[in-house]
């Protein structure tokens, strides 16, 4: 959530910044107008409460002196009614103000490419050239089906579209990938966490998914009243429970930065994705992802973003997967992010790079919503900065391995770093499936 004081005192700057993220200036004008009325009413209410205290003392004095206090009592009643009306007005204005604030995205960083969509994204660097073959490479969904290690048909029968069974060596490969990711992340200084996979609304609001993105997730409902949500949502990413671990808490400065990592399932409705990536592992309703989260001091967050991005890159490099790093434009970056780097891995059958990680600096945006603060050496409280990044999306990593390491005979060579995690298996063949 943005700081209303920053918007109030820098209105033109705020309009210019948020215009690059699709926010109309009229929304900020309305917000500032509500804020001014709220502060005016709040000040008047506080003044009247002070007056009421004075009148109360006068009444007590008159009663002690056995004087008539009826006029003062009547005056206090009138003041009390006015205070009640003002406080009600302040509460309503506060609700309106928060309604707008909770739906405004983060301010983009000055270095972000400016543009309305991903066509304005800028390549920052590239690692290795795209994989070349002496034959026409197959798509990972065909490779997985032909090898008998991925089964979409039975998953569709059981769960519907955008689900998959991993079979035999497919399941082993998925497990090898996420165990490798977790091991490497812990070597890089992250503490592993196993978080809850169901979270409450306050947690979803803390990381910015609610109230704006309800349609993108799966929420649990009450069996006795299907129209009534239970205040529990299946997590769309481990970022939610990892960041909210620190919600409403004060961290001592000497504990920062904090680095945590977690494997979790991710559940997404993929609303608005009809017709996109209908085959394969790229866009699923349920998938596994290893997440990395950092909590740090404001003056450290930009350096921590670079470290976070390099941690994610390190995983792709050890797997030998070609990729490039892209700085997202103001119109393509996520709601909570001030700056985002996407890591896009090369997919030979699609002849293009596809996102496998997003590494974002959310500055104090999530910390303000979730009240994540730290106490400095002088005892003063400050909002922390939060960062998050995929390290990495497991299913997409499996897809990239199948496509980049495929052989002409239909087999897939296992990347060297994964062989120990695959019980020594160096090649996945048709005999690797189960059914």
Curated annotation (Swiss-Prot):
Gene Ontology molecular functions: ATP binding; catalytic activity, acting on a protein; serine-tRNA ligase activity; transferase activity
GO CC field: cytoplasm
Pathway(s) this gene product operates in, as recorded in its UniProt entry: Aminoacyl-tRNA biosynthesis; selenocysteinyl-tRNA(Sec) biosynthesis; L-seryl-tRNA(Sec) from L-serine and tRNA(Sec): step 1/1
SUPFAM superfamilies on file: Class II aaRS and biotin synthetases, tRNA-binding arm
Keyword Aminoacyl-tRNA synthetase annotated: yes
InterPro entries with a match to the protein in the record: aa-tRNA-synt_IIb (IPR002314), aa-tRNA-synth_II (IPR006195), aa-tRNA-synth_II/BPL/LPL (IPR045864), Ser-tRNA-ligase_type_1 (IPR002317), Ser-tRNA-synth_1_N (IPR015866), SerRS_1_N_sf (IPR042103), SerRS_core (IPR033729), tRNA-bd_arm (IPR010978)
Localization: Cytoplasm
Enzyme Commission code: 6.1.1.11
Region (Disordered) residue spans: 42-70
Annotated keywords: Aminoacyl-tRNA synthetase, ATP-binding, Cytoplasm, Ligase, Nucleotide-binding, Protein biosynthesis
Binding, L-serine: 237-239, 291, 390
Bias-annotated ranges (Basic and acidic residues): 42-69
Catalytic activity reported: tRNA(Ser) + L-serine + ATP = L-seryl-tRNA(Ser) + AMP + diphosphate + H(+); tRNA(Sec) + L-serine + ATP = L-seryl-tRNA(Sec) + AMP + diphosphate + H(+)
Keyword Ligase appears in the UniProt entry: yes
Main location: cytoplasm
Binding site for ATP: 268-270, 355-358
GO biological process: selenocysteine biosynthetic process; seryl-tRNA aminoacylation
Assembly and oligomerization: Homodimer. The tRNA molecule binds across the dimer.
Function comment: Catalyzes the attachment of serine to tRNA(Ser). Is also able to aminoacylate tRNA(Sec) with serine, to form the misacylated tRNA L-seryl-tRNA(Sec), which will be further converted into selenocysteinyl-tRNA(Sec).
Domain notes: Consists of two distinct domains, a catalytic core and a N-terminal extension that is involved in tRNA binding.
HAMAP family in the cross-refs: Ser_tRNA_synth_type1 (MF_00176)
Family per similarity comment: Belongs to the class-II aminoacyl-tRNA synthetase family. Type-1 seryl-tRNA synthetase subfamily.
NCBIfam families, sorted: serS
Protein name in UniProt: Serine--tRNA ligase
Species whose genome carries this gene: Lactobacillus helveticus (strain DPC 4571)
């Amino acid at each position: 959530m943005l700081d209303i004081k920053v918007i109030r005192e820098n209105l033109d700057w705020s309009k210019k910044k948020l215009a690059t993220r699709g926010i109309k200036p009229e929304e900020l004008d309305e917000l500032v107008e509500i804020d001014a009325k709220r502060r005016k009413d709040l000040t008047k209410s506080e003044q009247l409460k002070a007056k009421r205290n004075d009148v109360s003392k006068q009444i007590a004095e008159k009663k002690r002196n056995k004087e008539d206090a009826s006029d003062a009592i009547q005056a206090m009643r009138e003041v009390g009614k006015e205070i009640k009306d003002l406080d009600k007005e302040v509460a309503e204005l506060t609700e309106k103000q928060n309604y707008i604030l909770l739906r405004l995205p983060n301010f983009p960083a000055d270095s972000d490419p400016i543009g309305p969509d991903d066509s304005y994204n800028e390549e920052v660097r590239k690692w290795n050239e795209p994989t070349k073959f002496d034959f026409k490479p197959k798509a990972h969904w065909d490779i997985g089906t032909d090898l008998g290690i991925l089964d979409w048909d039975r998953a569709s029968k059981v769960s519907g579209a955008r689900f998959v069974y991993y079979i035999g060596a497919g399941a082993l490969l998925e497990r090898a990938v996420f165990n490798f990711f977790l091991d490497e992340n812990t070597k890089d200084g992250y503490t592993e966490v196993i978080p809850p996979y169901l979270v409450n609304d306050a947690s979803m609001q803390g990381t910015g998914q609610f109230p704006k993105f309800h349609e993108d997730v799966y929420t649990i409902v009450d069996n006795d009243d299907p129209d009534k949500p239970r205040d529990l949502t299946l997590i769309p990413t481990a970022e939610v429970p990892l960041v909210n671990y620190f919600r409403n808490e004060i961290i001592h400065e000497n504990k920062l930065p904090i680095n945590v990592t977690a494997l979790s399932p991710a559940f997404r409705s993929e609303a608005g994705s009809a017709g996109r990536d209908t085959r394969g592992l790229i866009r699923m309703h349920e998938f596994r992802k290893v997440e990395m989260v950092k909590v740090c001091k404001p003056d450290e967050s930009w350096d921590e973003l670079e470290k976070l991005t390099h941690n994610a890159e390190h995983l792709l490099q050890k797997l030998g997967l070609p990729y490039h790093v892209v700085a997202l434009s103001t119109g393509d970056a996520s709601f909570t992010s001030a700056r985002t780097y996407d890591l896009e891995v090369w997919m030979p059958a699609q002849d293009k790079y596809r996102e496998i990680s997003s590494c974002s600096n959310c500055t104090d945006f999530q910390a303000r919503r979730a009240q994540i603060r730290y106490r400095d050496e002088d005892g003063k409280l400050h909002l922390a900065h939060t960062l998050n990044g995929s390290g990495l999306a497991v299913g997409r990593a499996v897809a990239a391995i199948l496509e980049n390491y495929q052989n002409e005979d239909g087999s897939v060579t296992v990347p060297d770093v994964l062989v120990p995690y695959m019980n020594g298996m160096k090649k996945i063949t048709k005999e690797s499936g189960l059914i």
